[in-house]
């Protein structure tokens, strides 16, 4: 793996040099865009809007439009905005992970101790494990400030980027039913169905089946085999009075599968 960021984790007066690596990889197939006429690859170029000429990457700068005029920024400007956060992951507090709603989670990264940091890294990892808490921190990655938590995962410390509160869109514009705690027959049946389908979560039991099937189609097409037309799926809108019968049928279906 290639590190995407180097810096340090600040834990009180302890400074832990680390390297950061992406913890995830895409499972989807890498598709290329081609010209329909001859299957030639489509290439995208960086061109000058005024001249239409291609611009070398070395000659491209970043700018911010202010009062109808661009202000050009370089690396030193981004660092000057907060030099500490560009190189330091400063733990500001510790919280219980259950206090953080799942909607805030964004991207996980592995942290690896750099030279001479094994003991301090191990101490932080093991202390987090023993406390059952996560560290809340902020740092700058790719010229953007990120909020994140630090938590142990197996034998590594994971930094999981989380979204700021202002990044979460309001639900006010959605047409939603009111929340009800009223006891009804439908609620009782729904809870029974949930109980029937409850099991211990095992991530190894879930695979990207769509990608596997798509790759199978690609291999068959490469051999000249004709693919069957996929059935058209329609969304069926059921009325409220169908809920009870559908819940009963779902429970019976589960019972038959279990027997």
Swiss-Prot record:
Signal peptide: none annotated. GO terms for biological process: DNA recombination; double-strand break repair via nonhomologous end joining. It holds the Pfam family Ku. It comes from the Bacteria. One of its GO terms (molecular function) is double-stranded DNA binding. InterPro entries: Ku70/Ku80_beta-barrel_dom, Prok_Ku, SPOC-like_C_dom_sf. Keywords: DNA damage, DNA recombination, DNA repair, DNA-binding. Gene3D superfamilies: 2.40.290.10. Transmembrane segments: none annotated. Residues 9-187 form the Ku domain. The keyword DNA repair applies. With LigD forms a non-homologous end joining (NHEJ) DNA repair enzyme, which repairs dsDNA breaks with reduced fidelity. Binds linear dsDNA with 5'- and 3'- overhangs but not closed circular dsDNA nor ssDNA. Recruits and stimulates the ligase activity of LigD. PANTHER family: NON-HOMOLOGOUS END JOINING PROTEIN KU. Homodimer. Interacts with LigD. Belongs to the prokaryotic Ku family. This is Non-homologous end joining protein Ku. It comes from Flavobacterium johnsoniae (strain ATCC 17061 / DSM 2064 / JCM 8514 / BCRC 14874 / CCUG 350202 / NBRC 14942 / NCIMB 11054 / UW101). The gene is ku.
């Amino acid at each position: 793996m290639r590190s995407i960021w180097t810096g340090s984790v600040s834990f009180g007066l302890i400074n832990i040099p680390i390297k950061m690596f992406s913890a995830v990889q895409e499972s989807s197939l890498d598709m290329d865009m081609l010209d329909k006429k001859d299957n030639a690859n489509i290439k995208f170029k960086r061109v000058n809007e005024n001249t239409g000429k291609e611009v070398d990457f070395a000659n491209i700068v970043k700018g911010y439009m202010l009062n109808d005029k661009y202000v050009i920024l370089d690396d030193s400007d981004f660092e000057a905005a907060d030099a500490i956060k560009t190189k330091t992951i400063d733990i500001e507090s510790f919280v219980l992970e259950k206090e953080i709603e799942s909607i805030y989670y964004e991207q996980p990264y592995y942290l690896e101790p750099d030279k001479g940091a094994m003991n301090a890294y191990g101490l932080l990892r093991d202390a987090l494990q023993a406390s059952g808490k996560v560290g809340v921190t902020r740092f700058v990655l790719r010229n953007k400030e990120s909020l994140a938590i630090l938590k142990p995962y197996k034998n590594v410390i994971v930094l999981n980027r989380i979204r700021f509160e202002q990044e979460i869109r309001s639900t006010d514009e959605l047409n939603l039913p009111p929340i009800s705690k009223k006891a009804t027959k439908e609620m009782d049946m729904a809870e029974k169905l949930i109980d029937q389908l409850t099991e211990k979560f095992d991530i190894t039991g879930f695979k990207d089946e769509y990608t596997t099937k798509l790759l199978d189609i690609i291999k068959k097409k490469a051999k000249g085999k004709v693919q069957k037309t996929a059935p058209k799926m329609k969304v069926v809108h059921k009325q409220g009075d169908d809920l009870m019968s559908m819940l009963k049928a779902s429970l019976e279906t589960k019972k038959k599968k279990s027997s």
